[in-house]
Amino acid sequence: MDENTAPDNFLTHSFNLKPGTDTWRFLQNQFEEAYKMKDVITHIPTRTQNRLHRYTPVPPADVMKNEPDTDFDLAQNQEWVRNIFAKWKKSPADSPEIIPLQIGAETVVCEKRHKYMDRCQDDEVCVCEMSQADAGQVMKILEIAEKDPAGWRKTTLQERHKIMYEAANRLGEMRGDLIGCMCAVTGKTVVEGDVEVSEGIDYARFYTTSMKQFAELPDVDIAPKGTILVISPWNFPCAIPIGGIVAGLAGGNTVILKPATVAAPVAWLFAKAFWDAGVPKEALQVVITDREALKVLTTAPAVKHIILTGGTDTAQNIARSNPATPLSAETGGKNAIILTASGDRDHAIMNIVASAFGNAGQKCSACSLLLVERSVYEDKNFQDKLKDAATSMKVGSVWNPGNVVGPMITNKNDKLLKALELEKGESWLVPPRFLDKHKYVLAPTVKWGVRPGNYSFRTELFGPMLSVVCIENLQQGIDLVNSLEYGLTSGLQSLDEGEQKLWKDLIMAGNLYINRGITGAIVNRQPFGGMKLSAFGGGVKAGGPNYCACFVNIADKPGSTTDYTQSYVKAYEQEFAHARDVNNLYGEQNAFRYLPLKNMVLRLFPGDNNEDAKMIALAARICHTPLSISFEPGDDRTAALASLGCPLKEEALAGFLKSMKNYERIRTCGADIPMEMYEEAARIDKYIATAKPVKDGRVELIHYIKEQSISFEYHRYGSILEVPPVE
């Protein structure tokens, strides 16, 4: 198409071309000028990345640049992969490595150890064994973290920034080993493991950089919270735990990392990068435990904040067992792509299969639902192409670098096995096929005719199965997606600008994607985190500008004279009012924006002062978040607060507890509130913002918004007609 239409191309003029005309001379001149360049144009490839070479360290910087992934098309990098396999693919003759338990600066080998078998070798080869802590050892780990004998909390942000950059460089040096460990222990393909290492490096460089904007605020004091517990998942065993520990360490906290047991050797490996870079072993401890000892960790008074990436039920259990400890959790997702009649079907299919089957469908952001407008749904050609795309993906052992889909982490996923049964009206476009003896490797599977309410429509599965639903129009698709309990990622495949705007305005999810895949969020480019039951905490995204502020205590300096009214207005206009794209990639827009909350309630207690209430009311109004104010009978605030324009309600605590479910978020003037409030909030999955209000708007206004990332691929096979506005 470009050849026939572009003004510089020969075919544009060839039909009416005559010698001696202006067009003839234009084309002749083009040719002659091009010919003159033949001896000066370089023949050296521009793609020169070579993973066989020693990693080039990156010095500390004030602006983070994302780490490049590996270019696997290059011969030298393919040789590098073969070297990884030679080292990490163990044989039955190899003795498994024994990983000790770390307690501060000491290590001990425990009798109780978890064995890690290579699922790509039919569980017949043991890769390593890792020591598990008992409850007594967990108590020692907690004591060390609380006392901070190495003085990590006394370090400056600049010192921590330098150390985190050094850790990032160490991670870059061990990229091959991290990938090999993920292949052997978790069954990740080389490509999927590679992007994880890049993401972990990005986190190490980004979070201390992002902390500087808060450290430079003139009228606030920032202090570490104390000990942060990071509980990380098996499906991203490298990037996500690195993100959690750096977020904690960046603020001067000591960190205890409890990785998913089935993926923990990866954490032991990358922890060495941080220790070698200068993080004291007393400040970063890695531990795996049994269920009983884990409860000691999650309920310990020494732990001041918990960072979790895992299942929604896990987050609920932790919150309900320890409701007063702040929890920041990225949890489940039942993620959908909507394809309308206005979508590019071929391009959509490419995005759909990559999103559904990458990492064997085990990403929390994976597409497990495809909602297709009827005219496309009933198109036999579309069905054939989708089937062909799914069945064309290479599936099998990760030790074959050509395989795109590898094994699942477990062969005992009861939810997935149940979804592999058909309900009434359903059929298989691509039937399920297990390709190995122990049923770890499931080929991409596509279920057709799934109806809203069916098991596979509403259940998060963590496997390479896509459920296809017929819809009548986009609005119906939006309504169905919004009816789900989750709101992590969501996608639209449509070239219609009106449909894009409607979907963007109405869909309830944290990360939105238009005309591209819905997985693979990149640090600072697409800050990541969901809504509804896909997130617990303050609605602040990992890999975004505000994440690290969650894990420090920020207070007004004594005697602060900041005019909070001016500060709130200024902060809103400069930071919160407008969407922005900090990367400005040509061809893909990545907008980051703040949304007001549906509603919010401020609960006042007799010890709270009215000035704090006025600050909260002003902040909510500036952020366009409707606020109600509730107070105890006998503590009448009507006269003092009537001018704020907020609904005022005098009610006993029991009545307030019953009404909490009606608000998206609860606000208080401090953390010293009745335990019943914490318990009820945990029971109904609500977040209480308990930080004492501060006068600086850049800090305070975070409590009254939620964050959303929108990634929009606006080029058409490399051609760009118009760059859309960021909104």
Q: Which functions belong to the PLM regions below?
A:
Residues 163-164, 178, 182, 186, ...:
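Extended, hydrophobic alpha-helical segments in both membrane/secreted and soluble proteins
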Residues 7, 11-129, 147, 559-564, ...:
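Hydrophobic face of amphipathic alpha-helices that form TPR/SEL1-like repeat modules
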Residues 114, 127-132, 148-153, 337-340, ...:
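Short, well-ordered beta-strand elements within core beta-sheets of diverse protein domains
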